[in-house]
């Protein structure tokens, strides 16, 4: 399927989605938002794809909302809600996507651009990456899940500081506060991310989907509910062909060949 604002590449079980508006630092216009949702729908149906990498073209991840389109005319409250709900559908889809997702961040990831990175399961950043909840600078509030996602990574107090000051932080600070998983030199960003994605893609797809769902759910339920979820997940995993293959491979001292069944 062709997209106007997105490049999609699939190799060795890894689908790379590249936001492709480099002239606008990959600002999230309506076309980009539509393309992102459609791409996830397409990739979910592809059994050969096991991991998704989300990134941006031209040396930046995403500058967030398209400020130029905002400046073109004043939007009504109803129009504003419609635009945000389109973004929110993508972030919710991304967070709950059954396949593992990795944000590969170079350059700016600010505003909604920061929040779609936070919606991924992991963030690998280059040493020149910048992150920020900057919407207060233009009289707006965080959207795209920023109020929910950010505090779960960095804590409520730090999240409030980032939002209310609209400060942009560098990659080293993002790593220090737990916003990102790893920071690597820019020249190593793609290789590092692909190595991580490849390692995950080589694992059991069914168990990965179940484990991701359990971890997401556990963040908002008590221990008893989390334990019940684990019992349900394990009852599905233990009866799978992948589990049998994993046990055989362990006993035979070889690499397993998981099929997602």
Predicted regions and their residues:
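Glycine- (often His-adjacent) and acidic-residue-rich active-site loop
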Residues: 56-93, 109, 139, 222
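Conserved CoA-thioester-binding segment of acyl-CoA-metabolizing enzymes
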Residues: 1-57, 92
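Hydrophobic alpha-helical membrane-association signature
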Residues: 32-35, 83-86, 116, 189, ...
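Short, charged, surface-exposed hinge/linker loops at domain edges
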Residues: 212-221
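Conserved phosphate-binding and hydrolysis motifs of nucleotide-dependent enzymes
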Residues: 20, 26-29, 56-58, 64-66, ...
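Crotonase-fold acyl-CoA enzyme core
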Residues: 92-208, 231, 235, 239-240, ...
